[in-house]
Amino acid sequence: MSATGYGEQEIEQDIQAKGLTGPRITPRDLDTLITAELYHVFPGTTLTVCCLILMNGYAVTGQSAAVSPENFDEEIGRKIARAGAREKIWPREGYLLRESLHLQGD
C-alpha cells in the first residue's frame, strides 16, 4: 500500500469497476517483467538492498534500513527493499507505453 493508503489492488479494482479500458500498465505487467531478484544486507548495518533484474537486462534497486538495530529483521527489510525497487518500474514502463502510443499517432 502506498503512503496515501490507496494501494495497487484498490486502484485496480476501481479501474475495473469504472470500466476504464485504455492502454495501461497493470501490476501483473510489472511482475512479468521481473526475471531475477538479488538481495544484500551490508554486514554490520541494517541496510538491505534489493536489485530486480528485468527481462531486458535492466536493473532497478530499492533499499531499506532500520533506524534501530533492535528493530532490524532481514525478511521485513527484503520486503520493503523489493517494494521500493518494484515501485521504480512504474514510471519507466509508463514512459515506454506513452512513447509507443505517441509513435502510433495517439
Task: Show where each model-derived region lies.
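Domain-level marker for long, solvent-exposed, non-transmembrane regions
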Residues: 1-106
